C-alpha cells in the first residue's frame, strides 16, 4: 500500500488463491509455529475432495471443547481481519480505482506436489482452487489496467473468473 502497488503475484504454493482487495490489515503474531502446525494437521484432514465448511469467520464456532482447538480457532478468527477487505466499485469483473492490494498465489505449475485446501476458507480469499492439476496465469497489462486469467494445463479451462483492476488515468 505504501508503495502504491496494485497486485502481488506470488508462487511456490501448492494451491491457487486470489484475495479480495485488501487495505490496511493488521498482523497477528501470538501463535507459535508448532502450535499452529499441530492444529492445522487436524483441519487439513479433509479427504480427497474437501469442501469448504463455510467461509470464515462464520465457520469458527465452538467446534470442540479442547483448549488447544479453542486457541487455534481464536487465532484463526484474529487473522480473518474483515476490516482489511476493501469495499470496491466494480464494473463487470473489474474493480475500479481500488486503493488496496490484490494478492494472487499461483498453484503448482510443475504438478510435482499439491496440498489439499483447508476446509475453513479465509475471509480475505475471493477464490481458491485445487484439483491436483497444474495451472498457469495469463496477465495482461495496459496503461491503466491489469487483467488476470488462470487456467488448468490439462484442458485449458479457466479455474477462476477473469479479474481486472482498472485505474483512471492521471
Q: For each predicted feature, which ranges?
A:
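Long, structured stretches of catalytic cores involved in phosphate-ester chemistry, encompassing
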Residues: 1-147
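Generic beta-strand structural signal
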Residues: 141, 165-167
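Short, solvent-exposed aromatic-acidic interface loops
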Residues: 149-159
Amino acid at each position: 500500500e505504501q508503495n502504491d502497488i496494485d497486485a502481488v503475484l506470488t508462487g511456490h504454493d501448492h494451491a491457487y488463491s486470489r484475495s479480495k482487495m485488501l487495505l490496511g490489515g493488521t498482523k497477528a503474531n501470538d501463535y507459535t509455529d508448532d502450535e499452529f502446525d499441530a492444529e492445522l494437521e487436524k483441519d487439513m484432514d479433509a479427504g480427497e475432495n474437501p469442501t469448504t465448511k463455510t467461509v470464515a469467520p462464520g465457520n469458527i464456532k465452538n467446534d470442540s471443547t479442547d483448549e488447544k482447538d479453542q486457541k487455534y480457532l481464536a487465532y484463526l478468527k484474529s487473522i480473518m481481519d474483515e476490516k482489511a477487505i476493501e469495499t470496491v466499485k466494480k464494473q463487470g469483473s473489474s474493480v475500479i480505482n481500488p486503493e488496496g492490494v490484490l494478492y494472487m498465489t499461483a498453484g503448482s505449475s510443475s504438478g510435482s506436489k499439491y496440498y489439499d485446501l483447508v476446509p475453513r476458507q479465509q475471509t480475505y480469499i475471493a477464490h481458491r482452487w485445487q484439483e491436483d492439476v497444474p495451472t498457469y496465469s495469463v496477465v495482461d497489462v495496459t496503461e491503466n489496467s491489469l487483467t488476470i486469467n488462470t487456467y488448468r494445463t490439462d484442458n485449458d479451462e479457466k479455474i477462476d473468473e477473469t479479474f481486472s483492476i482498472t485505474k483512471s488515468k492521471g
